[in-house]
């Protein structure tokens, strides 16, 4: 019964994507030509590289882009809610990173801080997962979306006070959820550990983000919805459905509960964080380079492929478990089908960057975003291959899976968001980053740290899996063979955390200086803010 309900709900999510497609076709959103890719620019802006952190720029040139004065009326409405969301995300990143390092160290120093219940492995690891997922990735992703969406819709954000209320509710809920997890009160499901009673606040907060974005889209001043808008609208429509169904108390139990759990857990990555990351990349890559994406037709193929194929991917995590074989097989098929939208995104974004490699030499935000886009391709290909039974036999229950999860959530989404914040904050505050060299230091710390982290978990996980498959070897061998790789993981995690702390301090230094005085052009543009936006 529950398996059937789950599949029905999965198809419902896919049908929601199909409904979007039908609406898009009927409203001529699918009449594609490359000219639609210029939606991200205002007249005269195309061909102008746009990055306030470019190497060699003096203090004056490092300020907001010339064409931002044209958008000042739009940006002024979004400024406060976006700044609150970004600041909240950065705080949760710093805190979540500390818990992540603690959890990593406990894997090879198991007795460290074990006398304190809130600091035992099970709790600090869960705190790390929830704080970076629902704190850093979600709040920052929403903040970037609420800043980008009005720009691509060419109209001011509607109901801008609602996201401020949503940010307050979300932060309160996340703080309460963290306290509950630390005390041992959880729902006991991966990615769903925060008690459902607290999740009600998160749901209310989510509504405060969805309504303004939908209203802004409905009141847009352009006929065509740029591909970034589709990803953002999809994310903010899919996630509430997933979150509500997975958190209904008492509806599922036993094997069915595990099935629903992984249906939700994987869709959080694919139908929530992925659209936030890919959508941001589709805006910032052409915006920083000053040229449109390589193929606009391919960009929409990538979105609709994600909408139609992804919702049933997660059950491959239960290969070998007591679930119907056909359900797992269906999930594997959908996992392999994901090659189609991923290749579309990969060709589009990588070719756009490859044709303009000179910008990478001067723009660190573009390095973050383009490297994040590369890691999206790698994580997606790896996930599709890992879903195959022959591969999963080796990698299941190993640290290989942990490395894969971080390749997507950190290597892809976090890197894109780092670049997005570096590009956005000077436009929110009117002030340049005070220590441009620290941006490069942050980049190399997290790149080096993540390289050590991912390579060690991938290699160690494969050795761990092979050791567990060898019936002639005791289980303890799979533990001892892994230890040096876990130590390397901790070293990589410490480097990443140092980068995060530099990022947080740099962010605070900009925000603490306050908003810079507006130019005459910006003041004039703000006078054109529509009354309906307030």
Predicted region positions:
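Feature marks short, highly hydrophobic, charge-poor N-terminal signal-anchor/signal peptide-like helices
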Residues: 1-10
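Amphipathic, hydrophobic secondary-structure cores in small proteins
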Residues: 7, 16-38
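Hydrophobic cores of alpha-helical transmembrane segments in multi-pass integral membrane proteins
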Residues: 9-21, 83-108, 121-155, 159-183, ...
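Non-cytosolic membrane-interface motifs at loop->transmembrane helix junctions
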Residues: 188-199, 224-228, 256-266, 323-334, ...
């Amino acid at each position: 019964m529950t398996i059937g309900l789950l599949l029905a709900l999965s198809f419902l999510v896919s049908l929601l994507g199909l409904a979007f497609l039908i609406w898009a076709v009927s409203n001529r959103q699918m009449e594609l030509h490359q000219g639609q890719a210029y939606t991200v620019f205002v007249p005269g802006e195309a061909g102008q590289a746009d990055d306030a952190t470019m190497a060699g720029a003096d203090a004056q040139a490092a300020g907001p882009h010339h064409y931002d004065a044209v958008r000042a009326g739009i940006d002024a409405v979004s400024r406060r809610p976006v700044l609150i969301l970004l600041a909240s995300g950065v705080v949760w990143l710093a805190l979540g990173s500390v818990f992540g390092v603690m959890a990593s160290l406990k894997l090879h120093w198991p007795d460290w801080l074990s006398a304190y219940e809130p600091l035992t492995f099970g709790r600090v690891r869960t705190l790390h997962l929830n704080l970076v997922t629902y704190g850093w990735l979600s709040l920052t992703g929403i903040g970037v979306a609420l800043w980008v969406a009005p720009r691509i819709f060419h109209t001011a954000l509607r109901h801008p006070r609602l996201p401020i209320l949503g940010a307050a509710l979300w932060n309160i809920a996340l703080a309460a959820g963290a306290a509950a997890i630390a005390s041992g009160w959880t729902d006991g499901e991966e990615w769903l550990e925060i008690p459902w009673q607290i999740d009600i606040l998160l749901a209310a907060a989510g509504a405060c983000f969805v309504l303004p974005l939908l209203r802004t889209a409905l009141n847009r001043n352009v006929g065509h919805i740029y591909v970034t808008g589709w990803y953002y609208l999809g994310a903010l429509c899919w996630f509430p459905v997933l979150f509500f169904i997975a958190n209904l108390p008492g509806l599922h139990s036993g094997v069915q509960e595990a099935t629903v759990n992984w249906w939700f857990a994987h869709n959080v990555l694919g139908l929530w964080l992925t659209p936030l990351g890919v959508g941001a990349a589709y805006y910032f890559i052409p915006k920083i380079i000053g040229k449109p994406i390589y193929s606009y037709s391919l960009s929409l193929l990538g979105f609709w492929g994600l909408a139609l194929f992804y919702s049933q991917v997660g059950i491959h995590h239960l290969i070998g478990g007591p679930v119907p074989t056909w359900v797992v097989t269906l999930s594997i098929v959908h996992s392999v089908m994901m090659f189609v939208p991923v290749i579309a995104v990969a060709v589009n974004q990588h070719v756009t960057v490859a044709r303009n490699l000179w910008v990478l030499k001067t723009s660190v935000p573009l390095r973050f975003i383009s490297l994040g886009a590369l890691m999206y391709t790698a994580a997606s290909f790896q996930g599709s291959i890992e879903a195959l039974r022959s591969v999963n036999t080796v990698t299941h229950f190993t640290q290989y899976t942990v490395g894969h999860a971080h390749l997507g959530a950190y290597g892809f989404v976090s890197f894109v968001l780092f670049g997005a914040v570096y590009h956005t904050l000077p436009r929110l505050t009117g002030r340049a980053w005070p220590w441009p060299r620290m941006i490069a230091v942050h980049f190399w710390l997290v790149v080096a740290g993540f390289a050590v982290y991912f390579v060690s978990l991938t290699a160690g996980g494969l050795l761990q899996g092979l050791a567990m498959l060898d019936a002639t070897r005791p289980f303890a061998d799979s533990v001892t063979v892994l230890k040096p790789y876990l130590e390397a993981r901790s070293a990589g995690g410490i480097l990443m955390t140092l980068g995060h702390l530099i990022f947080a301090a740099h962010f605070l230094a900009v925000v603490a200086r306050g908003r810079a005085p507006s130019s005459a052009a910006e003041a004039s543009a703000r006078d054109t803010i529509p009354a309906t936006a307030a």
